[in-house]
Design a protein with these regions (language model features):
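Glycine-rich anion-binding loops of enzyme active sites
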Residues: 1-62
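Structural signature of the urease/amidohydrolase superfamily beta/alpha-barrel
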Residues: 46-49, 188-192
Length: 192
């Protein structure tokens, strides 16, 4: 007797056959209204903290599949075996990791560190999970209507490192920097 509302329908073009099924899981949280974070509390001068991602997380995989050339390859064929071998080779651009390993890095889950911050009384005004659309499209969900954010990345000294797998796929896809920022998390999985 529980309505599961919201969310999205997963699409798997070129991945799943008609008889295949997708098993997914999710969690739902409950919070007392006085403890809810409210974007209205975000004010000019607040600092945005970005928590690092482990790679592409769960977004941009349609583009990734095009870049790595796996669309249309039937599982169990010699072509599939050759592609698997190719994707398993270490790449210098990925610090010696294979593209397969870099793309399959598990999505970082932020629950524990966020709960520690909140329970410790840290003044967190809002949180934005950086998913499809990147920082460009997701940060606005955590801002008051009358507040804008300015995010700059000036390299590791004053910003953060973009995971090599994101740089690699963006370059292979010939994405302009602004398009890469709208497709991938660019190394930031969560903003506070």
């Amino acid at each position: 007797g529980c309505a599961l509302v919201g969310g999205e329908m997963a699409e798997h073009p070129g991945v799943m056959a008609p008889a295949d099924y997708d098993l997914a899981g999710f969690t739902v949280g409950v919070v007392d209204r006085p403890k809810m974070l409210d974007p209205a509390n975000v004010r000019p001068g607040d600092v945005i903290l970005g928590l690092p991602s482990t790679g592409v997380h769960s977004n941009g995989y349609s583009l990734v599949r095009k870049v790595i050339g796996v669309d249309g390859i039937k599982p169990g064929t010699p072509e599939a075996a050759a592609k698997a071998e190719e994707l398993s080779r270490p790449l210098e651009e990925l610090g010696g990791a294979s593209l397969a390993d870099a793309l399959l890095a598990p999505t970082r889950i932020y629950v524990k560190p966020i709960l520690e911050l909140l329970r410790g009384g840290a003044p967190v005004h809002a949180i934005a999970h950086i998913t499809g659309g990147g920082i460009t499209e997701n940060l606005n969900r955590a801002l008051a209507d009358d507040v804008d954010a300015v995010v700059t990345r000036n390299g590791a000294e004053m910003g953060w490192d973009v995971p090599p797998v994101i740089t690699y796929v963006s370059r292979q896809a010939e994405l302009a920097p602004n398009e890469a920022c709208k497709t991938f998390n660019m190394g930031v999985g969560l903003c506070l």
